[in-house]
UniProtKB/Swiss-Prot annotation:
PTM comment, free text: Under oxidizing conditions two disulfide bonds are formed involving the reactive cysteines. Under reducing conditions zinc is bound to the reactive cysteines and the protein is inactive.
Origin species: Streptococcus suis (strain 05ZYH33)
Family to which the UniProt record says this protein belongs: Belongs to the HSP33 family.
Domain of life: Bacteria
SUPFAM superfamilies (alphabetical): Hsp33 domain, HSP33 redox switch-like
Location within or outside the cell: Cytoplasm
Name of the protein this chain belongs to: 33 kDa chaperonin
GO aspect biological process, one term: protein refolding
Gene: hslO
Higher taxonomy: Bacteria, Bacillati, Bacillota, Bacilli, Lactobacillales
Entry GO terms, CC: cytoplasm
Alphabetical keyword list: Chaperone, Cytoplasm, Disulfide bond, Redox-active center, Stress response, Zinc
Cited function: Redox regulated molecular chaperone. Protects both thermally unfolding and oxidatively damaged proteins from irreversible aggregation. Plays an important role in the bacterial defense system toward oxidative stress.
Cysteine pairs bridged by disulfides in the record: 235-237, 268-271
Amino acid sequence: MDKIIKTLSKSGHFRAFVLDSTETVKTAQEKHDTMASSTVALGRTLIANQILAVNEKGDTKITLKILASGAVGAIISVANTKGQVKGYIQNPDLDYKRTATGEVIVGPLVGNGQFLVITDYGTGHPYNSMTPLISGEIGEDFAYFLTDSQQTPSAVGLNVLLDEEDKVKVAGGFLLQVLPGATEVEIARFEKRIQEMPAISSLLASENHIEALLSAIYGDDDFKRLSEEEIGFVCDCSKDRFLDALASLPKADLQEMKEEDKGVDITCQFCQTHYHFDENDLEELING
């Protein structure tokens, strides 16, 4: 079970989210059959979107798009306020590692591009916000987005660790934000702690990485846990939803599918679930 823990410093001037997204990224890897670099890039995007979405309320949905010039192409993710996320990567077959360390390469494969966030409040008027990719590592790009676009000083760490067979071993991250009222002394103390923090990969490799993240963020500062919530990879696709999409096509196209193809097969991009619509399904749409 994946989870997110929301916390607030005793002073009320800092808040932090810590996430275990291991099963989320495992599921994404299994559904899309991604190779190492693609797994890490997609996983980081899913974690970033979980953080963005749980920060919203109600039925808001967040679409995060990494529109990259590099080999990954585009990474698309959609999440709701419960931290339920789905996503896919345009190129799932990237597998590049540094020869000396075996470290999975992501940044150069993402390259330049845009970090685009679409916030849908359900009003019919989604809000778009976009910043340039500054490193392609996604975590740094996410932090830049929060600071530049949302005007909220933030520290972010997120990563995906793979085992020797390139399967997801652990995935997760954190978000630390400065809230109104924080003093310069407090900010300096937290900044120093973040600068001296071990690499996110080593924290995730800890036996209890959630507690390791909290300890690294807060040190000796007191904090309270506001909530602990389940999160995960969840796709809300259905045969009825795709049937509605087919119903929007011209009847001549539906007739052609029925007569020439004897039906139609559709695969959900987000979860790779296959749906088959036979001649009877198409006939009902044509006569509907």
